A protein has these predicted regions:
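Alpha-helix C-terminal capping/helix-to-coil transition sites in glycosyltransferase folds
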Residues: 15-18, 41, 125, 152
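Active-site-proximal loop/helix segments of hydrolase catalytic cores
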Residues: 84-149
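Pre-active-site segment of Zn-dependent metallo-hydrolases
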Residues: 1-25, 32-37, 84-89, 114-122
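Beta-strand-turn-beta hairpins that frame and shape the catalytic cleft
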Residues: 66-76, 102-108
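Metal-dependent catalytic neighborhoods of phosphoester/phosphodiester hydrolases
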Residues: 31-39, 166-172
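Active-site neighborhood of phospho(di)ester-bond hydrolases with catalytic His/Asp-centered motifs
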Residues: 2-3, 17-26, 46-49, 109-112, ...
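Binuclear metal-ion centers of metallo-dependent hydrolases, dominated by the metallo-beta-lactamase
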Residues: 57-73, 93, 145, 149-186
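Short, polar loop motifs at secondary-structure junctions
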Residues: 45-54, 62-64
Length: 186
């Protein structure tokens, strides 16, 4: 028997996007129908090379690239990958992006699908971090906690956590000074 999945969002109810960031080509991150609904002629779509090869549209960003999109908006592509034995094929090193979006000084880290990679030690002054927690595709609870303690964002939103007991993140980061906010981002 298959599993019924309710569509996450009715994107037609949203305003058109100025910017769309796509981390990689997996269907839970690259949804052509959602993109088509949310974009207009002025929308800038930032993608990795694998998405560009499928979509034939967008601005390709590779790990380490940075774009000053507007005077108060900067977009940086950062690495997102799996390193654990047997998991590297899900998100190979060098292919996928996480993003740091700086909006008028507010720094938001969108990790994409990744584990607690060494490059996270280079993240500085992150105000809000969106961190995934769902092995084998992303981080374990312990990896997420280690990552958060490494670069110390002010706020962490765990996402992509499926059946993971995400309250463990709250418990393990209690007293760290990091505000953990749980939403229904399964």
């Amino acid at each position: 028997m298959g599993t019924f999945v309710t569509p996450a969002t009715d994107y037609a109810q949203f305003p058109k996007a100025n910017i769309i960031l796509i981390t990689h080509e997996h269907k839970d991150h690259y949804d052509l129908e959602a993109i088509t609904t949310l974009r207009n002629k002025a929308t800038s779509i930032f993608v990795n090379n694998a998405v560009f090869n499928m979509f034939k549209n967008g601005i390709v960003m590779r790990n380490g690239d940075s774009i000053q999109y507007a005077p108060d908006i900067k977009i940086e592509a950062v690495p997102a990958y799996n390193y654990s034995e047997g998991h590297q094929q899900f998100h190979p090193k060098g292919r996928d992006n996480g993003y740091i979006l700086t909006l008028d000084g507010l720094r938001i880290y969108i990790a994409g699908d990744t584990e607690d990679i060494p490059e996270m030690a280079n993240l500085k002054d992150i105000d809000i971090a969106f961190l995934p927690c769902n092995q084998p595709y992303t981080m374990t609870v312990d990896q997420l906690v280690k990552a958060a303690k490494t670069f110390k964002p002010k706020v962490v939103f765990p996402y992509h956590y499926g059946e993971t007991d995400i309250q463990q993140v709250v418990k393990l980061l209690d007293g760290s000074g990091i505000d953990v906010r749980i939403r229904d981002y399964q």
